[in-house]
Amino acid sequence: MSLRHSTQLIVQTVKLGLPTARKACSLPIQNPVVAANRFFASSVHSRNPQEEDVIPPKENASREDATDSEAYVRSDWDNTPIPELEKETAEKAASERQHSEKVTINDKTSPPSVDEM
């Protein structure tokens, strides 16, 4: 590249507001995937809340599948009081603990040794 050509290139970049060759050399090369992710992230965050689609409640949700963190969400669409949901969750956890205590591992018998085979 000739000196004249590089000077023209620098003048064009300055006119366009792009970084000059000296600045461009000091900038790290940007990964195109990272650039795309930043673009989409900025476009997602710029949406207005009024444009958001309302998510309807799940029709097939059951109380057995609820966790503590889901209690507040379910209370919004299920009209169930939050203390009642927390009580159900505690009862479910207690019954699971009792069930796991009933299951015992039989470690009294060990596998046969090589000599026994």
Swiss-Prot record:
Residue numbers spanned by region Disordered: 44-117
Positions with biased composition (Basic and acidic residues): 60-77, 84-105
GO cellular component: a single term: cytosol
Residue ranges, compositional bias (Polar residues): 106-117
Name this polypeptide is given: Uncharacterized protein C16A11.15c
Upper lineage: Eukaryota, Fungi, Dikarya, Ascomycota, Taphrinomycotina
